[in-house]
Structures are given as structure tokens and as C-alpha cells.
């Protein structure tokens, strides 16, 4: 159940998942972050050696009523692999640092673990961009090559991503941030939906992801049922 946040005091600007997969890039990130993560670390630092632990972390992105029946992907040396089959159309995974924008200073941060669960529409039209970028990263493509290959396509109507894990680590500035749900729509002015306005519970980013607008709504509880902290 979504909550109406009283006075939305954002600790950071709307999260920029690709660069979608969604999420919250802190306004305090700076040249210092870029200096801290100038290049890709060894693959082992991005990997989760315990496969069962990665599956559990991926499922923590959404309530069990959703994630228990979702397909789960885990990171392998060449890309993501199916670790558990699903039957409800949802796909859950733990995104790594390159889920963020190519120019994000934490693009190579090996600490980032972002549990995400996409519904069927999101899994078809939003998730593939991240999976493709993962293959590029693991194949050793340069930033320039990835930037040139990136295609921005409009999301399928109804695309949604759950990010309700209290165990995630989105970046060095915000940690797990807040439990939230993201909605992907066509390019539009956020104010049309009342997003980013004083007192509105809806945050949005459109300029960075044209032709996609990403809406985020903070929810009351983490996926395990514990209460989300107040904003």
C-alpha cells in the first residue's frame, strides 16, 4: 500500500537507474566518488559467492506474495543467469553499479547491491537494457563503446519495478534509501502527474531518460513487513 508522504523532503535527487534501473542518485556525489571508483574492480568484488544468498536478496525487492513466484536472475561471469523459474511474469534480480548512468561517479562501485523486481511489462521493455549493459561490462567494452551502443526506447505501458528491500545498497550516500515502487511511462512533463511538487508523494525524472519518464513513490513498509523510516 502506497503512502502519502507528508512533506517530501528528498535526501537526494530522483534515482537514475539506467543511466534506467532505477533509482536515487544523491546530490552529494561528486568528483571524489569518481576518483574512488575510476575503473572496474575484479569481477569477484561484484559477485555474490553464495547463490542462495543472492536469490534471497533478489526476492527481498518485493513482498513474498510477488517475489516467491517470480523468476530470479543471478550474476554470472558473462551476464545474468536464471537461478529460479517463476510463474507470475515477474523477474527479480540484484542489480550492480552499472545499473546507474554511464556518467554516474559510482558506475564501478563494487559495493552496490540493488534488489529489484519487475512486472511482466517491465521485464520485457525496461530490464533488457540493464541485462545488455551487463554483458557489455563483463565483455570489457569501454565507456565510449557502451555510450555509443545505448539505445533509449520507450517502455511498455504498465511497466513497474519494486524496490522494497531494506538490505539493498544503492550508493555510498544513501545506502538502502527508502522502500519504493517505480513506474515507467512515456516522455512527459512530471508536473502533469503532480510529481516533484511541494507536498506530493511522487518523484519523477524525465529529462535524463527521454523518451522515458520514471515515477517513484515511497511506500509504508519494507518487503519484510517492517515499517519504512520516515522521510
Where are these regions (language model features)?
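N-terminal secretory signal peptides that target proteins for export/translocation
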Residues: 1-15
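Disulfide-bonded cysteine motifs in exported proteins
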Residues: 7-10, 19, 87, 112
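Bacterial N-terminal signal peptides
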Residues: 19-30
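Primary mode marks residue(s) on the alpha4-beta5-alpha5 output face of response regulator receiver
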Residues: 37-231
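Bacterial Sec-dependent signal peptides at the C-terminal "C-region" and cleavage site
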Residues: 29-38
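N-terminal non-cleavable signal-anchor helices
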Residues: 6, 32-33, 94
Amino acid at each position: 500500500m502506497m503512502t502519502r508522504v507528508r512533506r517530501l523532503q528528498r535526501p537526494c535527487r530522483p534515482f537514475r537507474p539506467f543511466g534506467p534501473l532505477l533509482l536515487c542518485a544523491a546530490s552529494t556525489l561528486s568528483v571524489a566518488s569518481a576518483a574512488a571508483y575510476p575503473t572496474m574492480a575484479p569481477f569477484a568484488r561484484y559477485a555474490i559467492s553464495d547463490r542462495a544468498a543472492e536469490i534471497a536478496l533478489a526476492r527481498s525487492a518485493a513482498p513474498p506474495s510477488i517475489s516467491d513466484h517470480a523468476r530470479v536472475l543471478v550474476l554470472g561471469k558473462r551476464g545474468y543467469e536464471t537461478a529460479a523459474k517463476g510463474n507470475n511474469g515477474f523477474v527479480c534480480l540484484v542489480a550492480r553499479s552499472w545499473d546507474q548512468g554511464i556518467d554516474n561517479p559510482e558506475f564501478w562501485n563494487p559495493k552496490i547491491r540493488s534488489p529489484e523486481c519487475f512486472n511482466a511489462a517491465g521485464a520485457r521493455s525496461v530490464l533488457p537494457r540493464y541485462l545488455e549493459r551487463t554483458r557489455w561490462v563483463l565483455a570489457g567494452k569501454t565507456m565510449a563503446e557502451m555510450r555509443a551502443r545505448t539505445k533509449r526506447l520507450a517502455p511498455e505501458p504498465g511497466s513497474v519495478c519494486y524496490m522494497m528491500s531494506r538490505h539493498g545498497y544503492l550508493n555510498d550516500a544513501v545506502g538502502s534509501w527508502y522502500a519504493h515502487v517505480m513506474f515507467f511511462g512515456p516522455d512527459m512533463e512530471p508536473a502533469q502527474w503532480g510529481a516533484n511538487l511541494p507536498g506530493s508523494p511522487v518523484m519523477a525524472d524525465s529529462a535524463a531518460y527521454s523518451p522515458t519518464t520514471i515515477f517513484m513513490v515511497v511506500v509504508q513498509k519494507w518487503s519484510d513487513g517492517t515499517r519504512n523510516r520516515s522521510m
